[in-house]
């Protein structure tokens, strides 16, 4: 998996729900080859994927053929992802913790770590980047705009490797949004439920302001205290 030129030509999406389908449609419209894997046999989603310019496949196919992989499945299922197959892959974590679908999970709501760091710990050897997670799927579909368009909305990105972050930023730009760097992977907690940026459908300047306000927000203080960065 991967490309020596460090560009994405084939994009894999694991998860064929609303978010995965919207991202597949946007990526296909932007000229990417898109492979989507659902929870069942590829034949079950093949007609729907063909209709939006994507193809249906398996996780194994995605691992073998895609230059980057988006995770668009319920977060509670992340341990089911095949770490060995995704070793070395650029993995874009678009998942969030929802107690309604994931159940009550203390491990997924611990302020000491972002959920993307949990995904990275499971996917040993993968290159995990947090992105495409804080905006709702309906807004993603409705708000995508060409570069330079007035009122273009922004998507935040958190990751540890500058090259991988740049790769994902280019993808976000192609999908129709201005990329905003949030910081290292641990900063992905600023994009999770409970943070101001979660659910944000705003432009680049507004999103940057939200991220800058996080340390002094109620959620930011809880996180800082849990991480030992502020006294209890």
Question: Which residues does each predicted region cover?
Answer:
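Short, conserved loop/helix-junction motifs that constitute active-site signature segments
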Residues: 83-88, 122-124, 147-149
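Rossmann-fold NAD(P)-dependent oxidoreductase module
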Residues: 22, 26, 122, 171
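Rossmann-fold NAD(P)-binding glycine/threonine-rich loop
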Residues: 95-146
